[in-house]
UniProtKB/Swiss-Prot annotation:
One of its GO terms (biological process) is translation. Belongs to the bacterial ribosomal protein bL12 family. Keywords: Chloroplast, Plastid, Ribonucleoprotein, Ribosomal protein, Transit peptide. It comes from the Eukaryota. PANTHER family: 39S RIBOSOMAL PROTEIN L12, LARGE RIBOSOMAL SUBUNIT PROTEIN BL12C. One of its GO terms (molecular function) is structural constituent of ribosome. The keyword Lyase does not apply. This is Large ribosomal subunit protein bL12c. Residues 1-47 form a transit peptide. GO terms for cellular component: chloroplast; ribonucleoprotein complex; ribosome.
């Protein structure tokens, strides 16, 4: 494909310079072959090589690749202990995504986790307390007037999500002071 284009280019360049323009036009090929892309491109595997690839590194890599899963887990545990690092520090999403992956033994060792994130839900607002409740909701959430009004009208709704216990209790206290019925979930 590329050779066809190159040979055409070289044949055009190799025309005799002493000939007249009419002779050059007569000697020039009448058609120019454009390589087609009818054949699919082939993927080429590129092997990454580093300048510091040593036989020791290759031997260690082959030894690690030959480990069973149980041996690999033991190696990881040993390296974590020896180097003082934790896999959870590098992959916090993986730890959260698979909380029961430790097996029955790990579940028995764990203490029940205390809830750290709470939602503040407005259950009911009396009609006499709507305006005051809208003001408090706007102060707590930085919502515009229309959004705060819509939130108060379609109850029950979450006012704050994923907040600390202190912040949830403070929001509940402020809303109850103006007459709203609030729960923390």
């Amino acid at each position: 494909m590329a050779s066809t284009a190159l040979s055409s280019a070289f044949s055009l360049l190799s025309l005799p310079s002493s000939s007249s323009p009419a002779a050059a036009a007569a000697a020039a090929p009448r058609s120019f072959a454009v390589p087609s892309r009818a054949r699919p491109r082939r993927a080429v595997a590129v092997v990454a090589s580093t300048a510091t690839e040593s036989p020791k590194v290759l031997e260690l890599g082959d030894a690690i690749a030959g480990l069973t899963l149980e041996e690999a887990r033991g190696l990881v545990d040993h390296l974590q202990e020896r180097l003082g690092v934790s896999a959870a520090a590098f992959a916090p999403a993986a730890v959260v995504a698979a909380p029961g992956a430790g097996g029955a033994g790990a579940a028995a060792d764990e203490a029940p986790a205390e809830k750290t994130e709470f939602d503040v839900v407005i259950e009911e607002v009396p009609s006499s307390a709507r305006i005051a409740s809208i003001k408090v909701v706007r102060a707590l959430t930085n919502l515009a007037l229309k959004e705060a009004k819509d939130l108060i009208e379609g109850l029950p709704k979450k006012v704050k999500e994923g907040v600390s216990k202190d912040e949830a209790e403070d929001a509940k206290k402020q809303l109850e002071e103006v007459g709203a019925k609030v729960s923390i979930a």
